[in-house]
Amino acid sequence: MIDKRDDKPFKLKSKYKPSGDQPQAIESLVDNIEGGEKAQILLGATGTGKTYTMSQVISKVNKPTLVIAHNKTLAGQLYGEFKEFFPDNAVEYFVSYYDYYQPEAYVPSSDTYIEKDSSVNDEIDKLRHSATSSLLERNDVIVVASVSCIYGLGSPKEYADSAVSLRPGQEISRDTLLNQLVDIQFERNDIDFQRGCFRVRGDVVEVFPASRDEHAFRVEFFGDEIDRICEIESLTGKTIGEVDHLVLFPATHFVTNDEHMEQSIAKIQAELAEQLQLFESEGKLLEAQRLRQRTEYDIEMLREMGYTSGVENYSRHMDGRSPGEPPYTLLDFFPEDFLIMIDESHMTMGQIKGMYNGDQARKQMLVDYGFRLPSALDNRPLRREEFESHVHQIVYVSATPGEYEMSQTNTIIEQIIRPTGLLDPEIDVRPSMGQIDDLLGEINQRVARDERTFITTLTKKMAEDLTDYLKEMGVKVKYMHSDIKTLERTEIIRDLRLGVFDVLIGINLLREGIDVPEVSLVAILDADKEGFLRNERGLIQTIGRAARNVDGHVIMYADKMTDSMQRAIDETARRREIQIAYNKAHGIVPQTIKKDIRGLISISKTSHNDISKEEMDYESMSRGERKEAINALQKQMQEAAELLDFELAAQMRDLILELKLMD
């Protein structure tokens, strides 16, 4: 295994000081962790600074920490915030590295085999390698991940044992180093020097680690001894400085040595023979022929190249696991005494629970029809109970914790006071009879004060009809439906904040990135229709959308008071009472949050003049104009990727492809 660097403490850098009930929450969380408490809940109201509290806890308990979010967008936002809080420590990002992913599948009803098709994002792949190498080299590591962290990753022991350790003065021939690099899946490329490659110039070997994007390393030999090792700029070759120790981790997470590979191949062949015998005994000759052809090809590739497309489907044999045994995941790269924080746990824990079943249903079909060996079923995400077995200490973070989290612990730390002094909004319940005219009057009041309104409906038809009616009444309104992609969605939020329109209508306004301080009214139609968006948790989340404005107000239109409505109203009133008392005791006057508009939407536009599909008539452009548009979009795509807004970058990429097809 790799010798870790000397322990370096987490050092939090921030211009803010804990305020409101953050100090109490931080102290309680830290005391409980240091006291050995396994699970606890940080129940933080919207806008109370939960991420800052999490950062304070990490800096004080000083443990390697895994922060899990329920999608890439949220993970990217958290990654950016933690990078700012901990500039001197290793803050890493680990999400699925696919821009596009079509899993391998088979549909028996139409005899359709769908081959795996994917597009790997090179930047995210680099960040994944950076995360695993940091975990093996140091302890001051925060990894912000999506639920993809519970998917199979390869053995951390094999990954670490395969690493190549180099020092000046070390006796090793140049050719031996080259062979070692090939063994850990580095490719020789003397022309196109990129991640996961090396090039050779006489007695000089330059290596580009899989975890880097700008800096590579030059290893200079004198005979069969390393003379010196330098860090260099990958593009220019300019020397940055000398290093006294270089560890090169494998270029792929699925790696094994030659001896282990032969053992793995023998196991694959034995399983193949067993499955072929089963198919033939059942008269499934087509399935047997299909399985033999595919598996023997993969075996040949593994033997000759040490790798094959879909190698993860043989991970059980390569890792030496028993049938049904859980795969190695990112969690196995952490030391035993690490901390897990689950952001928006009411969403994330549900995802963790659901991943396994969906994966197994698809793969079982591939096994039954001879596309994969049964061992492919063990290349899978963890079950929830297997995830739980990795938990040493965990903090669930949510404004509305789910039933699962509540069943895991009685330790609940509340964070209700906002640093800005803002209160949870007042709530009115009004009858549905005449609700549209009543709502129109409320909207006009907000428009007169240059404030915005959210309206949430239960059906697409209701949202569309209401949008049409309000437009007829002269209201500037837009409807945000599920088909709207990231680029358009961020454009809509930006326009709402700028006052291009005043009212936003949607079915699910709980998604990330739509906390708008200018919104002073949230109207909930059909509030008495129980369901996912009208249960206590959904209502509290929706109510929170009005908690960023000092004049925040919520109107529920309903003909009866449901239990969910009553509990949401009671909980909001309880929090509001606590907040009022705190403000009064400390002489705090609530203030609307001031939030930079561009910061809200990342970089969907770098300026008003940037190019988007909605605004430009590309078909009427000349070829030269389209070429200019493509260049501008490529620049925006790179900027999006650098800021980790990969969904937006993918949108830009798709638009660029469309434009290229026009020529």
From Swiss-Prot:
Q: Chloroplast: present as a keyword of the record? A: no
Name the gene behind this protein: uvrB
List positions binding ATP.
Answer: 44-51
UniProt main location, coarse: cytoplasm
Q: Looking at the keywords, is Cell cycle present?
A: no
Regions of biased composition (Basic and acidic residues) lie at: 1-10
By its UniProt entry, which PANTHER family does this protein fall under? Answer: UVRABC SYSTEM PROTEIN B (PTHR24029:SF0)
Protein name from the UniProt record: UvrABC system protein B
Q: Which InterPro entries match?
A: Helicase/UvrB_N, Helicase_ATP-bd, Helicase_C-like, P-loop_NTPase, UVR_dom, UVR_dom_sf, UvrB, UvrB_inter
Which UniProt keywords are present, listed alphabetically? ATP-binding, Cytoplasm, DNA damage, DNA excision, DNA repair, Excision nuclease, Helicase, Hydrolase, Nucleotide-binding, SOS response
Subunit relationships? Forms a heterotetramer with UvrA during the search for lesions. Interacts with UvrC in an incision complex.
- What organism does the UniProt record list as the source? Streptococcus pyogenes serotype M5 (strain Manfredo)
